[in-house]
């Protein structure tokens, strides 16, 4: 009897400790938290998974768009060290002013997002992962805006670029999902290695598995042997070791699928599952995240939207109507207008 009581006491203590350590969605509006908690309860420990965008979805602001001017400010990323293959158009130098790489990136975006999206991942070529990790950690700790210049037409303009700020709410959600046996994946339009430096580093609290971080991939080169590889290749071959990759150099040569627009949905099919769809997809950009939000989310899953711009909210509402009508016309279950959780950055900061 004493032994049985001891066992029961131990089990009760273990349960209490488990409850005490369980993550709660404290940085969420109450209705959103209830909907997310219900989703987690319904899918706990059943082999389900969730997919998150990173920039402006999992943290506030953009990693590459702030790392670029930060490294320019430090003088370590310059036009002179830019890979020749990335000099796509002439630089727009004016009397007394040499165009910044940040400005150059903006002008590439004016041509087409399909030009600047890969470029802003490729621009970090020539550095080792170890070097970039040091700079990413510096940026995350910087805590103040980074001055940058760009052209508004032919007029030189200035702006302050904010470094990423962790969304407390998303950090909670990542961990609560994983605590309940729901795998968390990141699919980002930023360079996979850069995003991994935040999402998989325990200091930032997301605790994503390194191999579950998926993004724009460029070949990595061993400077001593010339051998080429990528994390995605290593993961597929079952021999991925993030620490062993730290001294590999980032090259500008792109790997596919490219993880923006339809490529995000392609990444789910390529790297996660051909048939099982995520129970939650989170994003903030209609064009880049729209495919995985509408085509990727499971029938009873949640579309999680971070409403950071009024024009994007208007655009996503238009897409909801358009895709709902298209589903109905095709005789498919209408899911595009169901199960949306919409929050602002301020609500989950």
UniProtKB/Swiss-Prot annotation:
Subcellular location: Periplasm
Keywords: Disulfide bond, Hydrolase, Magnesium, Metal-binding, Periplasm, Signal, Virulence
Name of the protein in its database record: Phosphorylcholine phosphatase
Known outcome of mutating residue 283 to A: Decrease in activity with phosphorylcholine and pNPP as substrates. Slight decrease in inhibition by tetramethylammonium chloride
TM segment ranges: none
UniProt binding sites for Mg(2+): 53, 55, 284
Signal peptide positions (record): 1-22
Stated induction or repression of this protein's expression: Induced in the presence of choline, betaine, glycine betaine or dimethylglycine. Induction is mediated by the transcriptional regulator GbdR. The nitrogen regulatory protein NtrC is necessary for full pchP expression. Expression is also partially dependent on the sigma-54 factor. Induced via GbdR in bovine lung surfactant and mouse BALF.
Domain notes: Folds into three structural domains: the first domain harbors all the residues involved in catalysis, the second domain is characteristic of PchP and is involved in the recognition of the choline moiety of the substrate, the third domain stabilizes the relative position of the other two. Contains two sites for alkylammonium compounds: one catalytic site near the metal ion-phosphoester pocket and one inhibitory site. Sites are adjacent and share residues. Contains a high and a low affinity site for phosphorylcholine.
pH dependence remark: Optimum pH is dependent on the substrate: optimum pH is 5-8 with phosphorylcholine, 6 with phosphorylethanolamine and 5 with pNPP.
Function comment: Catalyzes the hydrolysis of phosphorylcholine (PCho) to produce choline and inorganic phosphate. Can also hydrolyze phosphorylethanolamine and the nonphysiological substrate p-nitrophenylphosphate (pNPP). Shows higher affinity and catalytic efficiency with phosphorylcholine as substrate.
Cofactors that this protein relies on: Mg(2+)
Family: Belongs to the HAD-like hydrolase superfamily.
Residue numbers annotated as active site: 53 (nucleophile), 55 (proton donor)
Entry's Gene Ontology cellular component terms: periplasmic space
Regulation: Activity is inhibited by high concentrations of phosphorylcholine, phosphorylethanolamine, choline or betaine. Displays different properties depending on the substrate utilized, the pH conditions as well as the presence or absence of metal ions. At pH 5, activity is inhibited by Al(3+) ions. At pH 7.4, the enzyme cannot catalyze the hydrolysis of pNPP, phosphorylethanolamine is a poor substrate in either the presence or absence of divalent cations, and activity measured with phosphorylcholine is independent of divalent cations or is not inhibited by Al(3+) ions.
Co-factor remark: At pH 5.0 Mg(2+), Zn(2+) or Cu(2+) is required for maximal activity. Mg2(+) shows low affinity with respect to Zn(2+) as a cofactor, but it is probably the preferred cation due to its abundance and its ability to work in a broad range of pH conditions.
Lineage top rank: taxon: Bacteria
């Amino acid at each position: 009897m004493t032994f049985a009581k001891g066992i029961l006491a131990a089990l009760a203590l273990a349960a209490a400790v488990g409850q005490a350590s369980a993550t709660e969605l404290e940085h969420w509006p109450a209705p959103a938290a209830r909907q997310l908690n219900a989703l987690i309860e319904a899918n706990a420990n059943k082999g389900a998974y969730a997919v998150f965008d990173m920039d402006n979805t999992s943290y506030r602001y953009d990693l590459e768009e702030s790392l670029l001017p930060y490294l320019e400010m430090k003088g370590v990323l310059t036009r002179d060290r830019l890979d020749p293959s990335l000099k796509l158009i002439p630089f727009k130098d004016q009397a007394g002013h040499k165009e910044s790489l940040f400005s150059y990136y903006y002008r590439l975006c004016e041509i087409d997002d399909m030009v600047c999206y890969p470029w802003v991942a490729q621009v970090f070529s020539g550095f080792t992962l170890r070097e970039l990790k040091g700079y990413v950690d510096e940026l995350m700790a910087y805590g103040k805006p980074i001055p940058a210049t760009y052209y508004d037409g032919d007029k030189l303009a200035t702006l302050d670029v904010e470094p990423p700020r962790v969304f407390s709410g998303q950090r909670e959600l990542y961990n609560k999902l994983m605590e309940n046996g729901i795998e968390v994946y990141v699919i980002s339009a930023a360079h996979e290695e850069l995003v991994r430096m935040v999402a998989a580093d325990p200091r930032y609290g997301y605790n994503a598995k390194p191999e579950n971080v998926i993004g724009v991939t460029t070949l990595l080169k061993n400077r001593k042997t010339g051998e080429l590889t990528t994390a995605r290749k290593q993961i597929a071959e079952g021999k991925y070791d993030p620490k062993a990759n730290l001294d590999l150099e980032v090259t500008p040569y792109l790997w596919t699928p490219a993880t923006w627009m339809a490529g995000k949905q392609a990444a789910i099919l390529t790297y996660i599952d051909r048939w099982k769809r995520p129970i939650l997809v989170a994003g903030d950009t209609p064009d880049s995240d729209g495919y995985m939000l509408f085509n990727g989310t499971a029938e009873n899953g949640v579309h999680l939207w971070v409403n950071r711009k009024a024009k994007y909210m208007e655009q996503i509402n238009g897409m909801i109507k358009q895709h709902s009508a298209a589903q109905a016309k095709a005789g498919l279950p209408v899911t595009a207008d169901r199960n949306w959780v919409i929050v602002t950055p301020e609500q989950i900061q």
